[in-house]
UniProtKB/Swiss-Prot annotation:
One of its GO terms (molecular function) is DNA binding. InterPro entries: Cro/C1-type_HTH, HI1420, Lambda_DNA-bd_dom_sf. The lineage of its organism: Bacteria, Pseudomonadati, Pseudomonadota, Gammaproteobacteria, Pasteurellales. PANTHER family: SSL7038 PROTEIN. It comes from Haemophilus influenzae (strain ATCC 51907 / DSM 11121 / KW20 / Rd). Gene3D superfamilies: lambda repressor-like DNA-binding domains. Pfam families: dnstrm_HI1420. NCBIfam families: dnstrm_HI1420. This is Uncharacterized protein HI_1420.
Length: 97
């Protein structure tokens, strides 16, 4: 008998504000815009994608596309999503000189 493995979905494990902050901060260290957008999508799914889309003032489909690997959202869109997620960027000196 073969055991079926379930696909891992990080959104299912983002159950607290602390986990969300730690996750996004780690992803931001990677300096990979596609990965960052994907992480924002994970967080939006963990928090209710439809509600986040409404709060950001964009369609649910538009939000999925913007935060997909093929999306190319404007910085304004990213900031609207961050605000809807109740998150903000914080600037500090780079550890990479």
């Amino acid at each position: 008998m073969t055991e079926q493995l379930k696909d891992f979905d990080v959104a299912e494990h983002l159950t607290s504000e602390e986990e969300i902050q730690l996750y996004l901060n780690e992803i931001l260290q990677e300096d990979n815009i596609e990965l960052i957008l994907s992480a924002l999508g994970d967080i939006a799914r963990a928090r209710n994608m439809s509600q986040i889309a409404r709060d950001a003032g964009i369609s649910r489909e538009g939000l999925y596309k913007a935060l997909s690997g093929t999306g190319n959202p404007t910085f304004a869109t990213v900031m609207k999503v961050m605000k809807a997620l109740n998150l903000q960027f914080q600037v500090q000196q780079s550890r990479f000189a």
